[in-house]
Every structure is written in structure tokens, then in C-alpha cells.
């Protein structure tokens, strides 16, 4: 995740879903600090600098999935099935990346194995973090037959 979550109500909800998700899988949310003094940077320059920080945080063998508006969309059950397949085929870390406000640098796209989209709608970066961790938790409950998800 590029930049920290600042809204208190989002922080509380995100922390809750992260804790719930950890009952099922090993899960951490790593935050890459927001860039400082970006007013003098173009959107492309900002993406490049964020991209450098993102790539530096990756480890060899990571399977990188970008949360991107042009990525594949899933229904919740389809996403759960996709996550399950990844959990059985990925030997290292499965890393989901939420970029900055302008998206990703070309080098980050090159490092990614897949792109997924949570919606065709646009959400704030604060909100998308919450939506993603809720969907990951929902996927875990679907896979474990917990009564959270209703079709």
C-alpha cells in the first residue's frame, strides 16, 4: 500500500478485517511511505518514485498482483476460488499492491504477474484498502464455509 491510512474509522475497520483474516492465513499489510514535496513532481515522476519504493519492498519469488482499474474483475466467490488456486501454486509470498493516486509506473507493471480490479467504479485510496481486506476476509470465510458470505 502506498501511503498510510489517515481516516480513523478506516483504520479501525481495516485493522479489524486484518485481524479476522489472520485467523485463516498469514497476512500483513505493508505501507510504503507517501512521497514528500510532490507538488513539484509530475504524475509520471511521482509514479516512478513510488515505483522504486514498491520494487524495493519486493522479495525474489514474490507473486505480484496489482489492484488496478484495468485488471480482471471477480464476483466474491470467483475471487475466493482464485485466491485458493494461488495459495496452492505460489511458493513464496502472494503480494497485492495498491498504488498511489496516479497508478503504477511501467516498471511496476512489468514486475506484476496479474492485475485485478475490485470495481469499475473509482474509490478513494483510503476506501479501497478497506474494500480489499474485507474481500480477502470474505474469500477466506467462503473457502472455510463460515457463515459470513451470502449469495
Regions found by a protein language model. Give the residues of each.
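Conserved nucleotide-binding/hydrolysis micro-motifs of P-loop NTPases
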Residues: 5-7, 35, 71, 102-103
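S-adenosyl-L-methionine/SAH cofactor-binding core of RNA-modifying enzymes
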Residues: 26-92
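Catalytic beta-strand/loop module used to bind and position nucleotide/cofactor moieties
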Residues: 68-70, 75-107, 112-123
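Conserved RecA-like P-loop NTPase ATPase core
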Residues: 65, 99, 132
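N-terminal beta1-alpha1 ligand-phosphate binding loop
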Residues: 1-21
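Structured adenosyl-cofactor binding patch, chiefly the S-adenosyl-L-methionine
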Residues: 106-150
Amino acid at each position: 500500500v502506498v501511503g498510510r491510512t489517515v481516516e480513523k474509522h478506516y483504520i479501525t475497520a481495516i485493522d479489524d478485517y486484518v485481524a479476522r483474516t489472520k485467523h485463516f492465513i498469514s497476512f500483513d499489510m505493508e505501507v510504503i511511505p507517501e512521497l514528500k514535496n510532490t507538488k513539484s513532481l509530475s504524475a509520471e515522476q511521482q509514479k516512478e518514485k513510488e515505483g522504486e519504493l514498491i520494487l524495493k519492498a519486493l522479495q525474489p519469488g514474490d507473486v505480484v498482483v496489482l489492484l488496478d482499474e484495468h485488471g480482471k474483475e471477480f464476483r466474491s466467490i470467483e475471487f475466493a476460488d482464485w485466491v485458493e488456486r494461488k495459495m496452492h501454486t505460489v511458493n513464496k509470498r502472494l503480494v497485492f499492491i495498491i498504488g498511489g493516486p496516479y497508478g503504477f509506473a511501467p516498471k511496476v507493471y512489468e514486475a506484476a504477474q496479474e492485475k485485478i480490479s475490485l470495481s469499475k467504479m473509482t474509490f478513494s485510496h483510503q476506501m479501497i484498502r478497506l474494500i480489499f481486506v474485507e474481500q480477502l476476509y470474505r474469500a477466506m470465510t467462503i473457502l472455510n464455509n463460515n457463515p459470513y458470505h451470502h449469495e
